[in-house]
């Protein structure tokens, strides 16, 4: 395919047009009075959203050179979303500001490489200053504030803070669609896996169709149990203790299952059998997790263990187990806390080294089940369009909250960027590097300007007053008042703020140092086929 090539100013200006188109579309959503953007979908109703990364991903421009500029900014939003889960609009605004100021200087004859070095030094100083002013987040109220600011809903803030309190920082919090119109929180404490009882005759509550086992023994094996004789010595030992039994096995079939059911119905023995969760290597890992949580041993050939030789000491224990037709929940396993902590540490290191998003997600689920539990926020809304928009907001809020717990918080509303201006201005640089520093100084003001503009205020006036205000004071764009940002609950996670700045500077620097752009030439339209004269009939 033939290529179209542009050089120097032509190349950069074409890319900048793309940057501006995308950034101008995204930045209208910034702040408490930001507007929505409507995205056409191939199927179904349009998506109405104020989520920066969702909007950025949808934008495709006809001009190849402009589209490359737009895609680079979209990459900033995506990268910020991957790292911090929020702050994508802020990152887009910062990118546009750095590119706009940088292009002016490059066009005037400044060296782009020197400018890039200055930008990198200024950003490193700004990030360091942001981290120094960070306030740790630990209590429920602070978590609720972070989530409320991100989602623009105090109710959502309460749900997320309650969920994090219940399941801990390592717990899994999932977002699902509710069948009703109300948004609600459902928390499952303990370890849950998606396997239910093998026979409905094993239930203890026939009205709710669940089996509740109090203080049970737990047999964990990756073998199939077909012959009751294999586990008969073990069953006789448990029978003497008068305690119930949960069997987690590859399967229970043959004559073993009806024998267990018959003893359950007769009241001889309270037993529930479920299939082991997962498949392949993941199943082995999950069975080992259950064993460590309950203080038991996995009966497996890998360890040279056989069912007929298993003793009561190899069984796990828990304070309660609840089994329904689809899932099993183990509450308060009797495992050694030190062994559980070691297992958690191993899974955390596996998460860090995992390259696949799917693997990371599954490891995160295992971590949550070992360390806390699972919380589900069920989102309700009047229409499907509203439901989609609300789900995106809650996902952003959840990510922002996790980021806040991880690295702390700073003043929100773009105030944190302005608060580090003095630290960046104090950086002693010369020549083009000083120009790079000055570009960052101007860009750091841009989020506040845009938030003020979206709320109907003059950005320059707000910036001037903010620079002369005492530390911690900022502009509440929602009310038009000047307040202490932290006390007013207008806060941003440090991780979100620094990621937005670092990613924006990285991609903007690449655009400024671009000297040639290569794009595919558009395919010429194929000519329409000539009409066959024989088909013209009596037209002549």
Curated annotation (Swiss-Prot):
PROSITE patterns, per database record: CHAPERONINS_CPN60
The entry's localization annotation reads: Cytoplasm
The GO annotation for biological process reads: protein refolding
Give any GO molecular function from the UniProt entry: ATP-dependent protein folding chaperone
One matching Pfam family: Cpn60_TCP1
CDD domains noted in UniProt: GroEL
- What reaction is this protein's catalytic activity? ATP + H2O + a folded polypeptide = ADP + phosphate + an unfolded polypeptide
Keywords (alphabetical) are: ATP-binding, Chaperone, Cytoplasm, Isomerase, Nucleotide-binding
The yes or no answer to whether the keyword DNA-binding is present is: no
Recorded GO cellular component terms are: cytoplasm
Q: Per the UniProt record, which EC number(s) apply here?
A: 5.6.1.7
Q: Which InterPro entries match?
A: Chaperonin_Cpn60_CS (IPR018370), Cpn60/GroEL (IPR001844), Cpn60/GroEL/TCP-1 (IPR002423), GroEL-like_apical_dom_sf (IPR027409), GROEL-like_equatorial_sf (IPR027413), TCP-1-like_intermed_sf (IPR027410)
Superkingdom, taxonomy of origin: Bacteria
Q: Which Gene3D superfamilies match?
A: GroEL (3.50.7.10), GroEL-like equatorial domain (1.10.560.10), TCP-1-like chaperonin intermediate domain (3.30.260.10)
Binding of ATP: at which residues?
A: 29-32, 86-90, 413, 476-478, 492
Q: What is its main location?
A: cytoplasm
Q: Does the keyword DNA damage apply?
A: no
Cited function: Together with its co-chaperonin GroES, plays an essential role in assisting protein folding. The GroEL-GroES system forms a nano-cage that allows encapsulation of the non-native substrate proteins and provides a physical environment optimized to promote and accelerate protein folding.
**Which NCBIfam families does this chain map to?**
GroEL, PRK00013.1, PRK12849.1, PRK12850.1, PRK12851.1
Please give the subunit comment from the record.
Forms a cylinder of 14 subunits composed of two heptameric rings stacked back-to-back. Interacts with the co-chaperonin GroES.
What does the similarity note say?
Belongs to the chaperonin (HSP60) family.
Q: Which PANTHER family does the entry mention?
A: 60 KDA HEAT SHOCK PROTEIN, MITOCHONDRIAL
User: What's the protein here called?
Assistant: Chaperonin GroEL
């Amino acid at each position: 395919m033939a290529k179209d090539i542009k050089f120097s100013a032509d190349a950069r200006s074409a890319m900048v047009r793309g940057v501006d188109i995308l950034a101008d579309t995204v930045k209208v959503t910034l702040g408490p009075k930001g507007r929505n953007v409507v995205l056409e979908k191939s199927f179904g109703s349009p998506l109405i959203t104020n989520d920066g990364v969702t909007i950025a991903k949808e934008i495709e421009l006809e001009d190849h050179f402009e589209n490359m500029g737009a895609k680079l900014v979209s990459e900033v939003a995506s990268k910020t979303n991957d790292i911090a889960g929020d702050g994508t609009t802020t990152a887009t605004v910062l990118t546009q500001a750095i590119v706009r100021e940088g292009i002016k200087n490059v066009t005037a004859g400044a060296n782009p490489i020197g400018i890039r070095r200055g930008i990198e030094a200024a950003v490193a100083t700004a990030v360091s200053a942001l981290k120094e002013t960070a306030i740790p987040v630990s209590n429920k109220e602070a978590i609720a504030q972070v989530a409320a600011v991100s989602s623009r809903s105090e109710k959502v803030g309460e749900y997320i803070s309650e969920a994090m309190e219940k399941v801990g920082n390592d717990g899994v919090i999932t977002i699902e669609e509710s069948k009703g119109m109300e948004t609600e929180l459902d928390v499952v404490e303990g370890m849950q896996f998606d396997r239910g009882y093998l026979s409905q005759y094993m239930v203890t509550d026939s009205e709710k169709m669940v089996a509740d086992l109090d203080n049970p023994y737990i047999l964990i094996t990756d073998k199939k149990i077909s012959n009751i004789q294999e586990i008969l010595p073990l069953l006789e030992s448990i029978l003497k203790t008068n305690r119930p039994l949960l069997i987690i096995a590859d399967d229970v079939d043959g004559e073993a299952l009806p024998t267990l059911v018959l003893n359950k119905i007769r009241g001889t023995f309270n037993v529930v059998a479920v299939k082991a969760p997962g498949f392949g290597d993941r199943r082995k890992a999950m069975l080992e997790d259950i064993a460590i949580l309950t203080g038991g041993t996995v009966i497996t050939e890998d360890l040279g263990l056989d069912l007929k030789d298993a003793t009561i000491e190899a069984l796990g224990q828990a304070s309660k187990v609840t089994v329904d037709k689809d899932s099993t929940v183990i509450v308060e396993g009797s495992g050694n806390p030190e062994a559980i902590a070691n297992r958690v540490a191993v899974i955390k290191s596996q998460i860090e080294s995992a390259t696949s998003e799917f693997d990371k997600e599954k490891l995160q689920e295992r971590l949550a089940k070992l360390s806390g539990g699972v919380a589900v926020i069920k989102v309700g809304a009047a229409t499907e369009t509203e439901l989609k928009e609300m789900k995106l907001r809650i996902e952003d809020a959840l990510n922002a909250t996790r980021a806040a717990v991880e690295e702390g918080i700073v003043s929100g509303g773009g105030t944190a960027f302005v608060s580090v201006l003095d630290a960046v201005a104090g950086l002693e640089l010369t020549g083009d590097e000083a120009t790079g520093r000055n570009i960052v100084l101007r860009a750091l003001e841009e989020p506040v300007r845009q938030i003020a503009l979206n709320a109907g205020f003059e950005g320059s006036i707000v910036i001037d007053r903010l620079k002369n205000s005492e530390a911690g004071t900022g502009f509440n764009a929602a009310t038009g008042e000047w307040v202490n940002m932290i006390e007013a609950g207008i806060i941003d996670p440090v991780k979100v703020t620094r990621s937005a700045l670092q990613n924006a500077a990285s991609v903007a620097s690449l655009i400024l140092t671009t000297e040639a752009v290569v794009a595919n030439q558009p395919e010429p339209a194929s000519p329409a086929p000539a009409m066959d004269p024989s088909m013209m009939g009596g037209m002549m």
